[in-house]
Structure formats: C-alpha cells, structure tokens
C-alpha cells in the first residue's frame, strides 16, 4: 500500500513530461494563412448547391427510413426485443441528426452554396426542426471562430484559472465525480448553453441565445434572433400537435430520445475539438487569430466521421477556412498537413476514452514556467 502514492506520482510526472514534449507549438508559425490557402487546390473552395442539397436529401431519406421502421415495426416486436430495438434506433437516429446539424452549421458559415439567402433558408429549417435557434447560434458561433482559444473572448468552453475553479472541480479527479459531471454535461450542456450561456463566455449580465437583447448579439442581429425564436415556437407547436395525435410517449420514443442524444453529441464533439492537454490557450497579451485557430484537434470517430460529414476529423481546416464545404475538407487537410507540421494535432484515441481522459486532465489552465511565455497557458489538473 505504501508504494501506491509514489508510483502514481511518478506516473503523473511522466505523463506530464510526455504531454509537454507532444505539445502543439505556441510560437507564431513560420507560415501564413495565405501560404496555406495557396497550397490548397482552388476547387476545394468551390461550393456546389447540387452537392450540398444532395447531402441534405440523403440525410433526410436516412432519417425518414429509420423513423418509418421504428414507428411501424418496433411496436410489433415482442417486449424483450423492443427493449433492444428502441436504444439501437435512438443511437442511430441521434447520429443521423448530428449529421443534419452539421449541414445546418455549414449554412451558418456560408459554406453550403454561393447564395446567402439559400444558406439561411436551409439552415433555418434544419436547425429549427432540431430546436436550435439558427440565427442566434450562427452569430455566437461566428464569434467563437473569431476568438478561438482566447481565454477572455472565446464564446464556448472558456478555461478557468486555478484560483477561479468552482468548488466541485476537485471531483473531476474522482471517477464517480467525473462520471456524474460528464453525464450532466452530455444531458444538460447544450440546452443550458442556449438558455443561459452555461459554460460560455463570461458577460457582465445575463446572456441567452433566445433573448434578442442579450449581450451576445449586436443591434443588427437582434431582429434575426427574434426570427429564430419564431421558428422555434412553430417547431414546438408542430411537436405539440404530433403529441396530441400520436401520444406523448410515442413522441418521446420517436423524436425525444434521439434529440437528447443529439444534444449529447454536440457537447461531446465540440468539447473534444478544442480541449486537449497539448493545446495552448492564450490571454489577450499573446493571442492572435491564426494561433487560436491552430489550437484545434482533429479526432477519429471511425465510421461516424462520414455520418458526421467529417466535422470531427477535419475541424482544423474548417477553422482556417470556414466557407470551405465539408466535402472538400478532407482533401484540403491532407494538402496542408505537411506545411502545418507540428502545428497539426490529430488524436486517434477512441472518443469516449478521450472524453474521460481529457475531462480529467483539462480542469484549469496555467502558465508552465513563471516569468516565461507570459500569455500562454496549458491545461492542468493538479488540484
């Protein structure tokens, strides 16, 4: 028993040393955004309305197929088989929904087509059907891209300093505590972020994606926030009418649970895209846009990469060129990887294992060496 403590401490030191050696460089890179753009074939920046609509129709057909199977055949199964069939349906449909969300997200970046009005129309319909305020998130998400990895200004997952940690942060190092926090984040993280900016950028007053007067938005955007709210009211009304016709339990089984899984996937994927022990964060004295965009990690979700339209394994190039359509991102990533060198971070750790590991390791940020590299911070968990 007496050797457990020192052994664990030795492992921790070795882990931290290895992480330090594998870190993404924090110095200004030897290349510019223009250098990267010149290396990418011009066709990678071309948006095709036909191709984009193909992906929308493709996903809607798959969504409809699984809905039809679930609604018409699962209730006919023996009860024991229903207990297996419903969770399978929920998992599949939640993943398909995430793919549709990515297409709506692409509309918000004007990466869907050459026509802004088409992008906004399609994105508004897709996201409203998923109870997401399209324009509201479009504007806040754009600010995330403008301030990625900035401790003070990034819109999502702003890291805390050690002195600012909440009282419950210490339980992230405890398996039970970490499990409960992950469960809570996956279940409530996305709706609470939209509702009251939970785990979002700190503002001087209440912030919500549903409030047109929220400090998240400027005066030009407030009318579109109202339009987003109107879209959600209509979506909720449709769901209410469906519940009256089919029953509340039916609606929960067919739409509700996949919706919850969609919400969990949003949190899981976005957290892992920018949270890693080897990625730097910057305060305002050191931050610049390019280094912030490079503070991004591509991850491997296996066959789900394709279902998610490669938002998972091509996220860095998306941050560099937000109007690039997803079906060109893989090619562009491979082209710029040799130029990026050590500035490109890829982690093939299975995503659930990565979530568990990084949730425990990335608790707060601090500067490594006092007096050196001021403005550059790294994740730590030494509580």
UniProtKB/Swiss-Prot annotation:
GO terms for biological process: unsaturated fatty acid biosynthetic process. GO terms for molecular function: oxidoreductase activity, acting on paired donors, with oxidation of a pair of donors resulting in the reduction of molecular oxygen to two molecules of water. Residues 1-30 are annotated as: Disordered. Pathway: Lipid metabolism; polyunsaturated fatty acid biosynthesis. It is a multi-pass membrane protein. It is found in: Membrane. Keywords: Fatty acid biosynthesis, Fatty acid metabolism, Lipid biosynthesis, Lipid metabolism, Membrane, Oxidoreductase, Transmembrane, Transmembrane helix. A motif (Histidine box-3) lies at residues 315-319. Residues 12-26 have a biased composition (Basic and acidic residues). It comes from the Eukaryota. Converts linoleic acid to alpha-eleostearic acid (18:3(9Z,11E,13E)) and alpha-linolenic acid to alpha-parinaric acid (18:4(9Z,11E, 13E, 15Z)). Converts a single cis double bond at carbon 12 to two conjugated trans bonds at positions 11 and 13. Belongs to the fatty acid desaturase type 1 family. This is Delta(12) acyl-lipid conjugase (11E,13E-forming). It comes from Impatiens balsamina. The gene is FADX.
């Amino acid at each position: 028993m007496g050797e457990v403590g020192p052994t664990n401490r030795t492992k921790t030191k070795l882990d931290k040393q290895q992480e330090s050696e594998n870190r993404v460089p924090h110095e200004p890179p030897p290349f510019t955004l223009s250098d990267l753009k010149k290396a990418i074939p011009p066709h990678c920046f071309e948006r095709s309305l036909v191709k984009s609509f193909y992906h929308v129709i493709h996903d809607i057909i798959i969504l409809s197929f699984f809905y039809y199977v679930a609604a018409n055949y699962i209730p006919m199964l023996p009860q024991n088989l229903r207990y297996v069939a419903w969770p399978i349906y929920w998992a599949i449909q939640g993943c398909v929904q995430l793919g549709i969300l990515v297409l709506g997200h692409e509309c918000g970046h004007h990466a869907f087509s050459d026509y802004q009005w088409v992008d906004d129309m399609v994105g508004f319909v897709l996201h409203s059907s998923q109870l997401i305020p399209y324009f509201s998130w479009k504007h806040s998400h754009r600010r995330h891209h403008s301030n990625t990895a900035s401790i003070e200004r990034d819109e999502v997952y702003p890291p805390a300093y050690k002195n600012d940690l909440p009282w419950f942060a210490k339980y992230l190092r405890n398996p039970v505590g970490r499990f409960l926090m992950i469960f809570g984040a996956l279940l409530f993280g996305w709706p609470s972020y939209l509702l009251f900016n939970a785990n979002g950028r700190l503002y001087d007053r209440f912030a919500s994606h549903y409030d047109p007067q929220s400090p998240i938005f400027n005066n030009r955007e407030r009318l579109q926030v109202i339009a987003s709210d109107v879209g959600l009211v209509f979506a909720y009304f449709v769901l209410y009418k469906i519940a009256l016709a089919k029953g509340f339990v039916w609606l929960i089984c067919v739409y509700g649970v996949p919706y919850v899984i969609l919400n969990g996937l949003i949190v899981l994927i976005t957290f892992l895209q920018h949270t890693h022990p080897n990625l730097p964060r910057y305060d305002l004295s050191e931050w610049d846009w390019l280094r912030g965009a490079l503070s991004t990690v591509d991850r491997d979700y296996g066959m789900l990469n394709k279902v998610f339209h490669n938002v998972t394994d091509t996220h860095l190039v998306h941050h560099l060129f937000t109007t690039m359509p997803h079906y060109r991102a893989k090619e562009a990533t491979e082209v710029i990887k040799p130029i990026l060198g050590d500035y490109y971070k890829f982690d093939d750790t299975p995503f659930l294992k990565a979530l568990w590991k990084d949730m425990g390791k990335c608790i707060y940020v601090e500067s490594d060496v006092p007096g050196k590299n001021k403005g550059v911070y790294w994740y730590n968990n030494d509580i």
